[in-house]
């Protein structure tokens, strides 16, 4: 819970940064708060163990000789060093089967047995590709374990030999080496950059061709995801430049698994900062990425929404590239998607558009998305309501008076005020700031807005917030009461009624200036 508060505080600090600094109003992806943004998808793990389908079955037909209960590690280690090729291959195969057939493979036991150097030596045996394959497979599964277990493989000097095996004439050996390297790269930025420094990218990308079997290409794409993953630090710029052309090819692939991983790779790159966002934009891939927001597979939609969502955390210019691809036309479906997590991510995306310039705010209005945001503000699950509160509050900073007046016309005040009673202090602050901003912008129409707030029970909620434990909240609640609700003469003064707009809707006096200070505390 403390981590959530810390992240939310940072988010709020960024949001309120130095007046109308629109770039800092854009909010980076918050992996702890937004569950959708956590990667706990089986097909997208950092590390993967190679377990043959037949080994998953309980009544596996593994020969009894290789079953754990009938196989002593000591004998396996001894036989793995045998000069007899048949005995050696059987022993290495036995080790591999121990590592791939068990739900809880005895990785530590095998490491302690001293077999690692023997397996690594087997990788050098060009005269025996079957032995290379079995040894690579065993090492792949050791590297699929904890960080310490992966490090044991790295420290045994296996990586240069795996890179060498990428050039093996035997495809199964190549593929197993790719898998092993994927597990090592997936351990973290240090391992990633170490493998990159040894030259993994060019041979890896050379496998991408029409003739490659689909299972092999899936593995290659998954390794590319791991190369793009992690942003502390992000991958080297030259690596990104090498990988992007391949992603531009793979984004047209018909295989869903390959497409999903390609788009996740883009989402990781765009999560690293504006410089990386610009590299992705310059690759020309965005026009091919945006249509995936309406892909029939939810997995593809989710990844695409994340990737474009990251791009719009960038500058106004970078955001405009996404909008120019007709991105907003996909959002009515995303905002009404049966999966709440998609709704939440979609509103988060839009909150970064409403943090943009006035033309971008207008684009959201013109796409008829504001009523849908307000509906989710009212009826969505709490995570979605929270994102909607940010979207509305951002609009009160970025928008023109007529754009903020449009919020009032769409009846934003009641659902906005309803969030004043939630336990999440950041949401309460964001709503109070939005209300304060609307009231300040209304100027001589503030009385009418105040009446709307009072009629829906908002005034009572604001009064109660004067006793809130959070200093910022009770001060702002007091200021709102003091500035806009302290007068007793709430009569129908004609001068306080908003000027008429078509259809008798609200309008603010356009001669007054938009406040430039942003949210004030």
Swiss-Prot record:
Keyword Transport attached: yes
One protein family per Pfam: Arm
Region described as NLS binding site (major): 137-229
Modified residues (Phosphoserine): 60
Origin superkingdom: Eukaryota
Main localization, broad class: cytoplasm
GO terms under cellular component: cytosol; male germ cell nucleus; NLS-dependent protein nuclear import complex; nuclear membrane; nuclear pore; nucleoplasm
Keywords from the named record: Acetylation, Cytoplasm, Nucleus, Phosphoprotein, Protein transport, Repeat, Transport
Assembly mode: Forms a complex with importin subunit beta-1 (KPNB1). Interacts with SNAI1. Interacts with TALDO1 isoform 1. Interacts with CYB1.
PANTHER family: IMPORTIN ALPHA
The protein's name: Importin subunit alpha-3
